[in-house]
């Protein structure tokens, strides 16, 4: 089988993977279960590869998957207003150029201690 079910229906699983992928692109490091980390690694690698392509079609494909969440918000004193950056903008303007010379392997999974409540194997997934 090419993917893990993660104990969810297909729509729930797809939504969870989209959320975790978006969170990883925004925060660049998240703590989750080992199985989830191994699954979102696939989607994050695809999103960064789309970001490296950088054309309109790649941007639209990434926009169809990445949630429209605010990645950062800055105050511009000269214009007296707030400017925000979405996860998609961060992917194409900050993350993708960082990996321009790298062919794959954009993420790292570090195993940590089991979760206290149910002893689920936990891991930290981060961008290299």
From Swiss-Prot:
UniProt keyword annotations, A-Z: Ribonucleoprotein, Ribosomal protein
Any one Gene Ontology cellular component term annotated for this protein: cytosolic large ribosomal subunit
GO MF, one example: structural constituent of ribosome
UniProt xrefs under PROSITE patterns: RIBOSOMAL_L17
Cross-referenced Pfam families: Ribosomal_L17
UniProt keyword annotation of GTP-binding present: no
GO terms for biological process, alphabetical: translation
Similarity annotation: Belongs to the bacterial ribosomal protein bL17 family.
NCBIfam families referenced in this protein's UniProt entry, alphabetically: L17
Assembly notes: Part of the 50S ribosomal subunit. Contacts protein L32.
HAMAP family, alphabetized: Ribosomal_bL17
Protein name per the record: Large ribosomal subunit protein bL17
Gene that encodes it: rplQ
């Amino acid at each position: 089988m090419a993917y893990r079910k993660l104990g969810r229906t297909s729509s729930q699983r797809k939504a969870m993977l989209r959320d975790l992928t978006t969170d990883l692109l925004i925060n660049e490091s998240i703590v989750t279960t080992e199985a989830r980390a191994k699954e979102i690694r696939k989607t994050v690698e695809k999103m960064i590869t789309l970001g490296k392509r950088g054309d309109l079609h790649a941007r639209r494909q990434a926009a169809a998957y990445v949630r429209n969440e605010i990645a950062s918000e800055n105050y511009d004193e000269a214009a007296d207003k707030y400017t925000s950056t979405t996860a998609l903008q961060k992917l194409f303007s900050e993350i993708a150029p960082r990996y321009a010379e790298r062919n794959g392997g954009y993420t790292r999974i570090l195993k940590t201690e089991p979760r206290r409540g149910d002893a689920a194997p936990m891991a930290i997934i981060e961008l290299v």
